[in-house]
């Protein structure tokens, strides 16, 4: 995290799968890096955090439909900018495992549906709004870099990440008025990914083998303000990294 901040100095950072409850979150260490922090965490599982240089004016934890024992997977903040309010959702979307899983796959579908309904009911697609994080879906075939045989096998066995049903859930985000910020700049790039399996050492291969499942989706007003976007392989290449590479988008806002 220190390396990422030193290199990019982001105004806003979203973390997913923090795996720590709120009481044990290293709040002081993060604040010493120069960031305000809003967390939604639980011990050993899930967990999300939004960090920002400027203090947010509003925030939300989870979704209105969440039960008391909901998995901690979503946090959103509202910031004031020179061009009005900016809403940022950071999510650790369920992975789903496979189509035939009786619990995880329906839970993933419900999470997406609940988020779409939440956006439609309480937020404006005309506003500056971002949905970002580990969405756990590759939107297009050019976002799949695990080899054609593996791609076919995953589809045949119903393994999650790019099933037709999952892509339909992403289409609902598009229908709300969101755009994949990376694809806005690179509509045909087919060899850049954000997740690389530890066990098969896909990051070390040439070409690298992975999936693009981490995204920043933005409303049209922000789409028109995109300056640049990329995935940071240098950070992913550090010693003992996450299996995900940082993804980022810069806006002229």
PLM regions: where:
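Active-site beta-strand/loop signature of hydrolases that rely on acidic residues for catalysis
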Residues: 4-23, 88, 115-143, 181, ...
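Structured beta-strand-rich core segments of catalytic domains in phosphoester-bond hydrolases
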Residues: 17-100
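Short catalytic/ligand-binding loop motif for oxyanion handling, primarily in non-cytosolic enzymes
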Residues: 22-24, 47-48, 96-100, 138-148, ...
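Metal-dependent phosphoesterases centered on the DNase I-like endonuclease/exonuclease/phosphatase
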Residues: 33, 111-213
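Conserved beta strand-loop-helix elements of the APE1-like EEP
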Residues: 44-59, 203-225, 251
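Active-site beta-strand termini and strand-to-loop segments that position acidic
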Residues: 52-54, 77-83, 219-220, 242, ...
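Surface-exposed cleft-lining segments at the edges of enzyme active sites
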Residues: 64-65, 93-112, 153-158
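Short proline/glycine-enriched turn/loop segments at secondary-structure junctions
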Residues: 202-207, 235-241
């Amino acid at each position: 995290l220190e390396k990422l901040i030193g290199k990019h100095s982001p105004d806003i950072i979203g973390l997913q799968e923090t795996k720590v409850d709120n009481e044990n979150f290293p709040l002081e260490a993060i604040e010493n890096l120069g960031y305000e922090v809003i967390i939604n965490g639980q011990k050993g599982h899930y967990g999300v955090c939004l960090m920002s240089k400027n203090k947010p004016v509003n925030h939300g934890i989870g979704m209105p439909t969440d039960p008391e024992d909901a998995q901690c997977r979503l946090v959103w903040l509202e910031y004031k900018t020179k061009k009005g309010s900016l809403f940022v959702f950071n999510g650790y979307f369920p992975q789903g495992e496979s189509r035939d899983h009786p619990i995880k796959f329906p839970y993933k579908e419900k999470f997406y549906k609940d988020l779409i309904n939440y956006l439609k009911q309480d937020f404006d697609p005309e506003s500056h709004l971002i949905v970002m994080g580990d969405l756990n879906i590759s939107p297009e075939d050019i976002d799949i870099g695990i080899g054609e045989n593996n791609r076919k096998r995953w589809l045949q066995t119903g393994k999650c990440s790019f099933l037709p049903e999952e892509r339909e859930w992403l289409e609902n985000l598009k229908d709300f008025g969101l755009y994949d910020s990376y694809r806005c700049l690179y509509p045909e790039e087919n060899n850049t990914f954000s997740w690389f399996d530890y066990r098969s050492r896909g990051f070390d291969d040439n070409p690298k083998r992975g999936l693009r499942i981490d995204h920043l989706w933005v409303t049209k007003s922000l789409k028109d303000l995109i300056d640049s976007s990329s995935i940071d392989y240098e950070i992913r290449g550090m010693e003992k990294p996450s299996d995900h590479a940082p993804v980022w988008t810069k806006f002229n806002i």
